[in-house]
Structures are given as structure tokens and as C-alpha cells.
């Protein structure tokens, strides 16, 4: 009798590294998770230690197999999904980073972005990379490291330094430096990649003065990139055969592989993607055009709206404001009041993402009166997540001409029934919550499994997708529009706050 086989998904996120073991029926067998340090050297700056990312991720891999009580030779393949845009530069010879990882949330490159705008690069970047000029993307982060670490640009030219997003870093470490590779989805988030020619963009490399020698090879999201040895007797070599940035992995895990299907992931930030099939839709409404995974991991395109603060705003209620002890408490307190008593919270702690793209916006609470209590502020913070999602959906529908009939949701905050119901109310559309919540890991597992024949095709996966609960709108259109108008007023007043500082 042959031993039962499994897929392992490594999910390297913004605040933790996770490993998930799945069987052929897409059941989760075991999960391991380790948090790591968030480093804030200056206001608006965010870093991670790349060695800590690697240490936490590699230890979760060992732990998850031990928890599942399976041996490494029962693993058919490993898929990787990761926080996108986060930028690492390391020495080819030693594998040692020359600087901390600069995280996607970090705003330190706002000045470089202003220069790009002044130099008239906006249209070129929009047309060729699908992105807007913002500190969010990797390109300006790589430039910043090369500008600030002495001698690094020359070393990069000589081929001594390598750049990678987190997927590239993990695969480099897992293959002992044999494989320097990324996939199309991660490359499409760097602002250095031409999403039409599917190659690094020479003009962007020239403008940011980034040597091509340091860039990884770009491949499909579902194929064998290399093999890793995860110990065990004789050290079984396991194929690494799936890579996708976290949001594209979630889109694939939700099986949004047809044009017009959309999902929203509620994690640290909020990320909404709509598959636009084989055509790259240029956004006129502040969204990104990005690469997604087609039915067999080939290139599809998607529209994306990124909201910077979702789950992070609930953490703020807990850690900084001390209004709740646990993120799960937010639903309980939000339902202790009938409404927000006119309060709007705009959680623009690190600026605003789509569709506004204002790095100078800052967080604010509007509509405070003497009758407002902590529960109103908690409720308004949760509601802000749903309002920001509507901002993105309005832009998406305008760009694509597609009216969304249902939104598939995933991520930690979808366990919050109050938030999901309010999301449906404020969108005026169905919200579908799947039974398997780990859809990001699921997407990475699907991509890895399809590449090695663990699953034969998408039809086999469709049978495994079960909707656990559907939320339907429960408020009238006039009420919906009235509340949303208040939100738009609040957003307007939070914008450009920092710009006026001398």
C-alpha cells in the first residue's frame, strides 16, 4: 500500500510565518505559526529581520510535519505564498542580508516617489507596470537600499548582491542558494516588471539605477522551481512547485479563475482582486492592474485595490488604545450599540491606499460628541474596513464595467459576523464566506499540487469549494448611501494632513 501524500503550503505573512499541511481533499491536517518582530526605526518606517523571517518559516515547516505526524517523504510538494513588495537584498556568497527587509507598509521612499512624479514617470509606470507611483512597491525600496548601503550598487553590478521579494528569499534559503527565482505575480508588484512583455523593464531599472544582475528569474506560478531537503532519514528532496503573492494566492484559493470573479482578503490590510481574464484592464480610478493566476497557473490579469489598514486597525484598538483585550472582542462591543452615534474612524495611520493613494493622509476620528463611548469607536473602526472595501469596489466596477453579484471573502477578520453583515449592507451585494478559511495557503497548495499532478485539474478542485455562510444586504439603499456619504466626507478631511508640516 502506498503511503498517503500531502501538500505543504508555506504562508509567509506580515506579522507571522505559517505552515499548513493539506490532504488530497483540501482538508487542513495541521497548522504551525510563529510571529516575529515588527521593527519601526522611525515614524512611518517598517522593517523585518530577513533572518528571523527565515528562522520562523523554517521552524514552522518542521513543526507542522511533527504535528501532523507525517514524514517528509509523504510530502508531494511545497507551495509558497508571501507578503508582497517587501524587499530584501543579500550577498550571493554568504546569503547574508545587507539591510533589514523593507516592508510593504513602509513609507520611507515617499520622496523618491515624488521625484518620479516630477520627472513625469506616472503615465509610463501605469502603462507598463500596471501600478501607481507609491512607496508601497519594491522598486523604490531597492533604490533606497542601494543609495544608503555604501558600495552596494557597485557590488550589485558585479553580481555580488541579489534582490528578492520574500518568496525569492525563502526559495534561495531552501535550496541552499541554488535557485534565484520569483513568479509573475510577485514580479508584477515590484514596479520594475513589464506586465505586457512579461520581463523586467529596462527603463524602470535605468530610472531607479537598479542593476539587472541582481534580479531573479521570473517563472509561472505553478511549476517545479527546485527541490529542498527537509531532513528525515536520508533527507528527502521535495519539489517546490507553487509560488504566488498572498493576494493572488487567495484569489486562486477562492477559485476566482474566471473573468469578473472577485474576492476580498481581510488581513493586516484589505485586498480586493477581480480577475479580468487574459486582458489587462487599465484603471482610470486609482486601482492597480496586476498579474493573477489562470486555471493552470498561467498569466491572467486582475484589478486590485489595496487598503493598508484592516486587521491592523483592530490591533490598534487592542494594543495602543486598550479598548479591547482581544481582536475577537471587537464584535461583542460593536453590537452593544445600535450605531456609531455619528462617529467615523479613518484609519489612515500610514497614508491611504486605493483608490486615493495619499501617503500624506493620517488617521482621524470624526463626529465626536459628548455621548460617544468606547463601543461607538470600536464599531466605527470595524465599519471603516467595510467602507474602504466599498471605495475599492466602486472603482473596480467603473473600470471593468462588470457589476459584481457576490464577493468571496477570506482572512482573519471574516470570522467577525458583524463586519461581514455590515460589509454586505454597505455594498448592497452578497458576501460569501467559504468553509476553508485558509484560502491563501489553499491557493499556494493548489498551485504546487497541480504542478506535480497531485491534483489533475481545476474541476477536481471546484468540488472542494464549500460556502459556509452567505450574508445578504439588510438595509435600504437610502440608508446605505447616507452612511457612505458621511464616510466620503471623513476621508476628504483626513487627506493631505502631513503635507502641511514644515
From Swiss-Prot:
Query: Does the UniProt entry include the keyword Zinc?
Result: yes
Regulation affecting activity: Activity of this regulatory enzyme is affected by several metabolites. Allosterically and non-competitively inhibited by fructose 1,6-bisphosphate (FBP) and unphosphorylated phosphocarrier protein EIIA-Glc (III-Glc), an integral component of the bacterial phosphotransferase (PTS) system.
**Mind telling me which GO cellular component terms the entry cites?**
cytosol
Q: Which InterPro entries match?
A: ATPase_NBD, Carb_kinase_FGGY, Carb_kinase_FGGY_CS, FGGY_C, FGGY_N, Glycerol_kin
| Source species, domain of life | Bacteria
Q: Where does glycerol bind?
A: 84-85, 136, 246-247
In this chain, sn-glycerol 3-phosphate is annotated as bound at: 14, 84-85, 136, 246
Enzyme class label: transferase
* Annotated residues for binding of ADP: 14, 18, 268, 311, 412, 416
One Pfam family from the record: FGGY_N
Q: Alphabetically, which GO biological process terms does the record hold?
A: glycerol catabolic process; glycerol metabolic process; glycerol-3-phosphate metabolic process
UniProt pathway annotation: Polyol metabolism; glycerol degradation via glycerol kinase pathway; sn-glycerol 3-phosphate from glycerol: step 1/1
Q: Does the keyword Glycosyltransferase apply?
A: no
Gene Ontology molecular function: any one: ATP binding
Q: Which UniProt keywords apply?
A: Allosteric enzyme, ATP-binding, Glycerol metabolism, Kinase, Metal-binding, Nucleotide-binding, Transferase, Zinc
| Catalytic activity, reaction form | glycerol + ATP = sn-glycerol 3-phosphate + ADP + H(+)
E.C. numbers: 2.7.1.30
Annotated ATP binding sites: 14-16, 268, 311, 315, 412
The similarity comment for this entry is: Belongs to the FGGY kinase family.
Stated role: Key enzyme in the regulation of glycerol uptake and metabolism. Catalyzes the phosphorylation of glycerol to yield sn-glycerol 3-phosphate.
Per its UniProt record, what PANTHER family does this chain match?
GLYCEROL KINASE, SUGAR KINASE
Describe its partners and assembly state: Homotetramer and homodimer (in equilibrium). Heterodimer with EIIA-Glc. Binds 1 zinc ion per glycerol kinase EIIA-Glc dimer. The zinc ion is important for dimerization.
Q: What is this protein called?
A: Glycerol kinase
Give the originating organism: Escherichia coli O81 (strain ED1a)
Amino acid at each position: 500500500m502506498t503511503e498517503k501524500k500531502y501538500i505543504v503550503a508555506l504562508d509567509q505573512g506580515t506579522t507571522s510565518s505559517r505552515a499548513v499541511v493539506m490532504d488530497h481533499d483540501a482538508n487542513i491536517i495541521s497548522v504551525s505559526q510563529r510571529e516575529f518582530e515588527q521593527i519601526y526605526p522611525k515614524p512611518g518606517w517598517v522593517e523585518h529581520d530577513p533572518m528571523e523571517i527565515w528562522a520562523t518559516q523554517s521552524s514552522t515547516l518542521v513543526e507542522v510535519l511533527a504535528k501532523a505526524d507525517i514524514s517528509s517523504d509523504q510530502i508531494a510538494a511545497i507551495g509558497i505564498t508571501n507578503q508582497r513588495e517587501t524587499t530584501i537584498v543579500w550577498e550571493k556568497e554568504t546569503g547574508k542580508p545587507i539591510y533589514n527587509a523593507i516592508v510593504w507598509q513602509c513609507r520611507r521612499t515617499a520622496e523618491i516617489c515624488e521625484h518620479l512624479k516630477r520627472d513625469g514617470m506616472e503615465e509610463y509606470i501605469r502603462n507598463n507596470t500596471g501600478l501607481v507611483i507609491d512607496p508601497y512597491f519594491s522598486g523604490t525600496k531597492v533604490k533606497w537600499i542601494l543609495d544608503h548601503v555604501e558600495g552596494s550598487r557597485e557590488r550589485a553590478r558585479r553580481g555580488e548582491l541579489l534582490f528578492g521579494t520574500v518568496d525569492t528569499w525563502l526559495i534561495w534559503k531552501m535550496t541552499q542558494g541554488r535557485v534565484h527565482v520569483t513568479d509573475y505575480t510577485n514580479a508584477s508588484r515590484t514596479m520594475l516588471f513589464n506586465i505586457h512583455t512579461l520581463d523586467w523593464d529596462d527603463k524602470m531599472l535605468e530610472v531607479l539605477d537598479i542593476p539587472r544582475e541582481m534580479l531573479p528569474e521570473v517563472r509561472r506560478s505553478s511549476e517545479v522551481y527546485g527541490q529542498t531537503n527537509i531532513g528525515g532519514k536520508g533527507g528527502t528532496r521535495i519539489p517546490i512547485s507553487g509560488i504566488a503573492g498572498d493576494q493572488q494566492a487567495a484569489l486562486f484559493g477562492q477559485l476566482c479563475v474566471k473573468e469578473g470573479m472577485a474576492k476580498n482578503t481581510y488581513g493586516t490590510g484589505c485586498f480586493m482582486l477581480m480577475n479580468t481574464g487574459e486582458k489587462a484592464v487599465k484603471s482610470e480610478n486609482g486601482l492597480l492592474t496586476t498579474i493573477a493566476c489562470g486555471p493552470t497557473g498561467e498569466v491572467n490579469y486582475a484589478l486590485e485595490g489595496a487598503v493598508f489598514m484592516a486587521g491592523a486597525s483592530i490591533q490598534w484598538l487592542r494594543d495602543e488604545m486598550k479598548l479591547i483585550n482581544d481582536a475577537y472582542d471587537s464584535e461583542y462591543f460593536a453590537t452593544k450599540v445600535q450605531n456609531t452615534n455619528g462617529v467615523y474612524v479613518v484609519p489612515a495611520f500610514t497614508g491611504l491606499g486605493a483608490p486615493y493613494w495619499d501617503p500624506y493622509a493620517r488617521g482621524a476620528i470624526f463626529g465626536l460628541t459628548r455621548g460617544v463611548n468606547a463601543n461607538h469607536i470600536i464599531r466605527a473602526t470595524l465599519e471603516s474596513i467595510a467602507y474602504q472595501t466599498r471605495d475599492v469596489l466602486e472603482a473596480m466596477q467603473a473600470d471593468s464595467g462588470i457589476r459584481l453579484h457576490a464577493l468571496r471573502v477570506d482572512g482573519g477578520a471574516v470570522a467577525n459576523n458583524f463586519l461581514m453583515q455590515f460589509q454586505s449592507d454597505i455594498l448592497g451585494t452578497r458576501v460569501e464566506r467559504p468553509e476553508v478559511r485558509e484560502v491563501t495557503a489553499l491557493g499556494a497548495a493548489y498551485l504546487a499540487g497541480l504542478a506535480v499532478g497531485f491534483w489533475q485539474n481545476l474541476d477536481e478542485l471546484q468540488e472542494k469549494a464549500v460556502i459556509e455562510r452567505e450574508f445578504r444586504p439588510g438595509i435600504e439603499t437610502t440608508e446605505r448611501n447616507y452612511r457612505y456619504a458621511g464616510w466620503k466626507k471623513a476621508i476628504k478631511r483626513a487627506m493631505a494632513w502631513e503635507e502641511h508640516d514644515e
